[in-house]
Amino acid sequence: MKIAVGCDHIVTYEKIAVVDYLKSQGHKVIDCGTYDNVRTHYPIFGKKVGEAVASGEAELGVVICGTGVGITNAVNKVPGIRSALVRDMTSAIYSKEELNANVIGFGGKIIGGLLMNDIIDAFLAAEYKPTEENKKWIEKMDSLQHASQDQNNPHFFDEFLEKWDRGEYHD
């Protein structure tokens, strides 16, 4: 599998460890940087990973910053990207199976390297399980990437709220 990986200067060493791990598992890696500890800005590298995945150059992506929050938000701004900030295998698997996430984000100063590798393995092994319901949710989420009058409609999510009221969703 070809995986794009990017980080900011705070977690360069953590990213290098992830790149080395992925290569040791037989994956091809597109290292989108950064490559040193010189101060930089996480949106640059979130965008690079997102563009690599959205264009098809990479199949999936991994982004890392100190907390994971900034770079995961940045990569989610790239059209075609569905990224999840994860700290456990359950969330990573859910993001892939139910939401068809194509990028996962980590807080490199929050989570240990061995756990990060385990979570990445779980994410890569998981497969999207399309259902009519999650297809609709993904379509609705993807529509938010493009400004439209529908988003200003206070009833934008009514079809889903009505199903909730009818008891069609189960936790």
From Swiss-Prot:
It catalyses: aldehydo-D-galactose 6-phosphate = keto-D-tagatose 6-phosphate. Disulfide bonds: none annotated. Keywords: Isomerase, Lactose metabolism. It comes from Streptococcus pyogenes serotype M1. Pfam families: LacAB_rpiB. This is Galactose-6-phosphate isomerase subunit LacB 2. It comes from the Bacteria. The keyword Isomerase applies. Coiled coil: none annotated. The keyword Isomerase applies. Its EC number is 5.3.1.26. Belongs to the LacAB/RpiB family. GO terms for molecular function: galactose-6-phosphate isomerase activity; ribose-5-phosphate isomerase activity. It is an enzyme of class 5 (isomerase). Gene3D superfamilies: Sugar-phosphate isomerase, RpiB/LacA/LacB (3.40.1400.10). The lineage of its organism: Bacteria, Bacillati, Bacillota, Bacilli, Lactobacillales. Heteromultimeric protein consisting of LacA and LacB. SUPFAM superfamilies: Ribose/Galactose isomerase RpiB/AlsB (SSF89623). One of its GO terms (biological process) is D-allose catabolic process. Pathway: Carbohydrate metabolism; D-galactose 6-phosphate degradation; D-tagatose 6-phosphate from D-galactose 6-phosphate: step 1/1.
